């Protein structure tokens, strides 16, 4: 028996979910896309074998960024394009988190306070790396928002892939070898200050909304108590790993860029009421265990992580900012004496891409091994 998928879970439990909850327009769109992905609802490419006449139908995917069936190719294409941005230099992985007491307010103001996470994280890196006490150079970094923990609970945090060196004001290359050059205590202090300053400014200018468990923070005294608690709490950014070299960086990036709240391979079992899936227990050094929750709760948790409309989740800063990226990276390569790594997939058609990535030849007939002609009929539809 095949393992259940996210699509299967939505088919079984989404009607019951709707009796209890009201999804946002973006959540409803994600559900509609997931339910119809690769079913024929979005059309199909129909190919005919030139030798035996056999017909093969390939159903189109939904391409929704929350769909677990639609992330593999976009991830590979994005990773391939980023090859040209990677230098032969150390890289570090930083994670910025906020106290979980802020979660209700953040969820009520997702776009606003997700943006605040990016602003605070990027401003922290820029301030500390430009300080001669730490590095005194302009670095490049990519920030990626994740909003989930292993159990699909709401846990907004920023993953940052940081170049371990940069250009000084005199356009000289400077790094600190493989040693991480920013004190964690300094990152924590500066990040907390910048995030809280922006949060308080949003409150003072009446830009925040409060729903659900965040309703109480409409009250000035309750909000002030929340702010005080945040200053008292530990803000724990951390550096996860040091790595070097193009392939290491690209592979590492791919683990985070197109990840969604849960992938199909983590789902173990589904019955008429519950869903069982694997989670990491970080209290036991990341050991895997099984968690069983109701199907309705599974959908509620999954939909918490549908991003706001047109929200940009992967953002580039510093040397990787598109306005000056080519010029600055070229200078860095010249100073480091390293070559530019070229894209392997650019300008290639999908059959070539699939063959190169997965050794799948979609131009070969499954019936006779003959050659499939180009799709003769396309049936584009939108649900």
Describe each model-derived feature in a short phrase.
Residues 1-383:
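Beta->alpha loop/short-helix hinge microenvironment recognizer with preference
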């Amino acid at each position: 028996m095949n393992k259940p998928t996210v699509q299967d879970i939505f088919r079984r439990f989404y009607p019951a979910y709707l009796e209890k909850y009201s999804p946002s327009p973006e959540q409803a769109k994600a559900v509609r896309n997931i339910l119809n992905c690769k079913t024929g609802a979005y059309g199909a490419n129909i190919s005919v074998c030139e030798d035996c006449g056999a017909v093969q139908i390939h159903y189109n995917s939904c391409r929704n960024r929350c769909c677990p069936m639609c992330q593999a190719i976009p991830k590979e294409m994005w990773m391939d394009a980023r090859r040209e941005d990677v230098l032969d230099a150390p890289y570090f992985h930083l994670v910025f988190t906020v106290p979980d007491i802020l979660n209700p307010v953040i969820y009520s103001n997702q776009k606003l306070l997700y943006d605040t996470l990016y602003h605070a994280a990027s401003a922290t890196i820029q301030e500390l790396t430009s300080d001669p006490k730490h590095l005194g150079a302009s670095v490049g970094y990519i920030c990626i928002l994740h909003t989930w923990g292993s159990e699909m609970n709401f846990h907004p945090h920023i993953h940052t892939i940081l170049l371990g060196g940069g250009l000084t004001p005199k356009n000289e290359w400077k790094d600190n070898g493989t040693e991480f050059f920013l004190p964690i205590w300094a990152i924590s202090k500066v990040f907390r200050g910048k995030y809280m300053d922006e949060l308080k400014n949003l409150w003072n200018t009446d830009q925040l909304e409060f729903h659900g468990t965040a309703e109480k923070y409409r009250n000035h005294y309750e909000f002030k108590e929340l702010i005080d608690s945040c200053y008292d709490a530990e803000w724990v950014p951390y550096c996860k790993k040091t790595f070097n070299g193009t392939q290491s960086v690209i592979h590492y990036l791919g683990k985070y860029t197109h990840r969604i709240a849960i992938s199909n391979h983590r789902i173990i079992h589904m019955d008429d009421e519950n869903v069982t899936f694997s989670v990491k227990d970080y209290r036991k050094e990341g050991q895997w265990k099984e968690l069983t929750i109701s199907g309705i709760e599974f959908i509620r948790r999954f939909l918490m992580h549908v991003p706001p409309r047109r929200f940009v989740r992967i953002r580039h800063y510093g040397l990787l900012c598109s306005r000056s990226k080519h010029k600055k990276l070229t200078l860095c390569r010249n100073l480091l004496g390293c070559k530019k790594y070229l894209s392997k997939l650019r300008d290639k058609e999908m059959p070539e891409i699939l063959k190169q990535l997965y050794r799948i030849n979609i131009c070969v007939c499954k019936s006779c091994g003959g050659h499939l002609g180009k799709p003769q009929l396309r049936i584009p539809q939108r649900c």
